[in-house]
Protein backbone atom coordinates (compact mmCIF):
# COMPACT_ATOMS: atom_id res chain seq x y z
CA UNK A 1 0.00 0.00 0.00
CA UNK A 2 0.91 3.65 -0.19
CA UNK A 3 1.48 4.19 3.52
CA UNK A 4 3.56 1.04 3.92
CA UNK A 5 4.87 -0.12 0.55
CA UNK A 6 6.87 -3.00 1.99
CA UNK A 7 5.79 -5.41 4.73
CA UNK A 8 7.77 -8.59 5.25
CA UNK A 9 6.87 -11.52 7.50
CA UNK A 10 10.35 -12.08 8.99
CA UNK A 11 11.50 -9.41 11.52
CA UNK A 12 14.99 -8.59 10.26
CA UNK A 13 16.89 -5.83 8.50
CA UNK A 14 15.01 -4.60 5.43
CA UNK A 15 17.54 -6.26 3.11
CA UNK A 16 17.39 -9.65 4.82
CA UNK A 17 13.61 -9.53 5.29
CA UNK A 18 13.16 -8.71 1.60
CA UNK A 19 15.53 -11.50 0.55
CA UNK A 20 13.72 -14.02 2.71
CA UNK A 21 10.44 -12.98 1.08
CA UNK A 22 11.95 -13.23 -2.40
CA UNK A 23 11.69 -9.48 -2.93
CA UNK A 24 13.93 -6.50 -3.59
CA UNK A 25 13.30 -3.06 -2.10
CA UNK A 26 12.87 -0.66 -5.01
CA UNK A 27 13.58 2.93 -4.00
CA UNK A 28 11.33 4.16 -6.82
CA UNK A 29 8.42 2.51 -4.98
CA UNK A 30 9.43 4.34 -1.79
CA UNK A 31 9.75 7.60 -3.74
CA UNK A 32 6.25 7.25 -5.24
CA UNK A 33 4.71 6.53 -1.85
CA UNK A 34 6.43 9.50 -0.24
CA UNK A 35 5.42 11.85 -3.05
CA UNK A 36 1.81 10.66 -3.06
CA UNK A 37 1.53 11.17 0.70
CA UNK A 38 3.24 14.58 0.53
CA UNK A 39 0.59 15.75 -1.92
CA UNK A 40 -2.26 14.52 0.31
CA UNK A 41 -1.10 15.69 3.73
CA UNK A 42 0.32 18.78 5.38
CA UNK A 43 2.70 16.68 7.49
CA UNK A 44 4.46 13.49 6.55
CA UNK A 45 6.37 11.28 8.93
CA UNK A 46 8.34 8.50 7.27
CA UNK A 47 9.16 5.81 9.80
CA UNK A 48 12.12 3.63 8.97
CA UNK A 49 12.97 0.22 10.33
CA UNK A 50 16.23 -0.96 11.81
CA UNK A 51 18.36 2.14 12.25
CA UNK A 52 20.21 4.66 10.10
CA UNK A 53 22.86 2.34 8.68
CA UNK A 54 20.67 -0.68 8.03
CA UNK A 55 20.91 -1.92 4.43
CA UNK A 56 17.92 -1.41 2.14
CA UNK A 57 19.69 -2.89 -0.87
CA UNK A 58 23.04 -4.59 -1.40
CA UNK A 59 24.85 -1.24 -1.75
CA UNK A 60 22.42 1.23 -0.17
CA UNK A 61 21.86 1.95 3.50
CA UNK A 62 18.86 3.86 4.81
CA UNK A 63 20.85 6.98 5.68
CA UNK A 64 22.24 7.28 2.15
CA UNK A 65 18.68 7.09 0.80
CA UNK A 66 17.57 9.81 3.23
CA UNK A 67 20.59 11.96 2.31
CA UNK A 68 19.89 11.65 -1.42
CA UNK A 69 16.28 12.71 -0.88
CA UNK A 70 17.21 15.39 1.70
CA UNK A 71 14.44 14.12 3.95
CA UNK A 72 14.69 15.89 7.32
CA UNK A 73 15.12 13.50 10.20
CA UNK A 74 13.79 13.20 13.73
CA UNK A 75 16.13 11.03 15.77
CA UNK A 76 14.65 9.10 18.69
CA UNK A 77 16.83 8.15 21.64
CA UNK A 78 16.31 6.97 25.21
CA UNK A 79 18.05 6.60 28.57
CA UNK A 80 18.87 2.95 27.91
CA UNK A 81 22.37 1.58 28.27
CA UNK A 82 24.38 2.44 25.17
CA UNK A 83 22.10 5.22 24.01
CA UNK A 84 24.66 8.01 24.48
CA UNK A 85 27.02 6.20 22.13
CA UNK A 86 24.19 5.36 19.72
CA UNK A 87 23.00 8.98 19.68
CA UNK A 88 26.49 10.38 19.09
CA UNK A 89 27.23 7.87 16.32
CA UNK A 90 23.90 8.73 14.68
CA UNK A 91 24.53 12.48 14.89
CA UNK A 92 28.02 12.02 13.47
CA UNK A 93 26.61 10.01 10.55
CA UNK A 94 23.92 12.65 9.91
CA UNK A 95 26.49 15.43 9.89
CA UNK A 96 28.84 13.50 7.59
CA UNK A 97 26.04 13.06 5.04
CA UNK A 98 24.54 16.55 5.52
CA UNK A 99 21.14 15.12 6.46
CA UNK A 100 18.95 17.82 8.01
CA UNK A 101 17.98 17.08 11.60
CA UNK A 102 14.63 18.45 12.77
CA UNK A 103 15.29 17.43 16.35
CA UNK A 104 15.89 14.78 18.92
CA UNK A 105 13.10 12.95 20.77
CA UNK A 106 14.13 11.68 24.19
CA UNK A 107 11.78 8.76 24.79
CA UNK A 108 11.27 7.96 28.48
CA UNK A 109 9.23 4.80 27.89
CA UNK A 110 10.07 2.21 30.54
CA UNK A 111 11.58 2.34 33.99
CA UNK A 112 14.99 4.02 34.22
CA UNK A 113 17.02 5.27 37.20
CA UNK A 114 16.65 9.04 37.64
CA UNK A 115 20.43 9.56 37.54
CA UNK A 116 20.70 7.85 34.17
CA UNK A 117 17.72 9.77 32.76
CA UNK A 118 19.27 13.10 33.82
CA UNK A 119 22.82 12.27 32.72
CA UNK A 120 21.74 10.96 29.33
CA UNK A 121 19.59 14.05 28.78
CA UNK A 122 22.57 16.31 29.52
CA UNK A 123 24.74 14.25 27.17
CA UNK A 124 22.14 14.39 24.40
CA UNK A 125 21.95 18.18 24.62
CA UNK A 126 25.74 18.35 24.59
CA UNK A 127 25.91 16.02 21.58
CA UNK A 128 23.52 18.21 19.58
CA UNK A 129 25.81 21.18 20.22
CA UNK A 130 29.02 19.21 19.61
CA UNK A 131 27.82 18.09 16.18
CA UNK A 132 26.48 21.51 15.20
CA UNK A 133 22.76 20.77 15.31
CA UNK A 134 20.07 23.07 16.69
CA UNK A 135 19.13 22.27 20.29
CA UNK A 136 15.68 20.97 19.34
CA UNK A 137 15.01 18.31 21.94
CA UNK A 138 11.61 17.04 23.00
CA UNK A 139 11.16 14.89 26.09
CA UNK A 140 8.50 12.26 25.48
CA UNK A 141 7.12 10.98 28.78
CA UNK A 142 6.32 7.32 29.35
CA UNK A 143 2.86 6.91 27.84
CA UNK A 144 0.52 3.94 28.04
CA UNK A 145 1.02 2.14 24.74
CA UNK A 146 -2.58 2.21 23.56
CA UNK A 147 -3.89 5.21 25.45
CA UNK A 148 -5.95 7.74 23.52
CA UNK A 149 -4.68 10.31 26.02
CA UNK A 150 -1.19 9.84 24.59
CA UNK A 151 -2.08 11.38 21.22
CA UNK A 152 -2.19 15.02 22.36
CA UNK A 153 1.26 14.58 23.91
CA UNK A 154 2.60 13.12 20.66
CA UNK A 155 1.00 15.84 18.54
CA UNK A 156 2.42 18.58 20.78
CA UNK A 157 5.87 16.96 20.58
CA UNK A 158 5.68 16.88 16.78
CA UNK A 159 4.51 20.49 16.63
CA UNK A 160 7.33 21.68 18.87
CA UNK A 161 9.90 20.00 16.61
CA UNK A 162 8.36 21.24 13.38
CA UNK A 163 7.63 24.81 14.47
Model-derived regions, located:
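C-terminal lobe/tail of nucleotide-utilizing enzymes
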Residues: 92-163
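Structural motif
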Residues: 45-47, 74-76, 105
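Inter-motif core of Ras-like GTPase G domains
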Residues: 57-80
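A general structural detector for well-ordered alpha-helical segments in enzyme core domains, enriched
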Residues: 33, 62-65, 90, 120-124
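Glycine-rich nucleotide/cofactor/substrate-binding loop typically near the N-terminus or early
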Residues: 1-13
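Phosphate-binding/switch loop-helix module in NTP-utilizing enzymes
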Residues: 13-56, 63
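Class I SAM-dependent methyltransferase SAM-binding "motif I" and its flanking Rossmann-like core
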Residues: 83
